[in-house]
Amino acid sequence: MNRNLWTSPQYKIRKKVFALANQYWIEDGRGTVLGYTRQKMLRLREDIRIYADESMVQELFVIHQEQVLDAWGTFAVVDTARNVCVGKIRRNIMSSFLADEYFLLDPFGQTIGRVYEESGRGLLRKYIPMGGLVPERVRVEVLGQQVAEIRQQFRVIGDEWDVDCARIPPQLDRRVLLAGMILMGMVERERDGN
């Protein structure tokens, strides 16, 4: 795998909603597709596989739920080629009533940061009729410093998230951040019934 795929200062995650399953594309700042996944339906444990493209031949990394039937659990992000965990993501169940928040963990399970939705927007999105039309604005902190911002843009048959990660430190593998964004999109889909 070309490790330079995961050093771009800009990414875009595109989500298209289809009848049976959502599809997600990861693109760099120039619009080149770097990854693709399709959400599986009726699963006991999340096992999200990110491929190089829609042919789903070359697997790049996996987002693997560590506990069965645990929607609030910890997810390992595994580099498929090396079979190595590059980091983990854990949902903060206590904040999920106000706004989405995930903790970013190193491969050993130590918290190094968080991805969180602005609480005012989160409240609007979750509890106000038609609140889902309020675009998400998500912030990323690593080691106590804000290092990235993610902005949602609505499209006719899906959404897009622009990820500005030029200031991400080397302690955080960008695949972990991108995996967190895909998880947030999938969890939101289940919550909203989309």
Where are these regions (language model features)?
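Intrinsically disordered, low-complexity proline/glycine-rich segments
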Residues: M1-N194
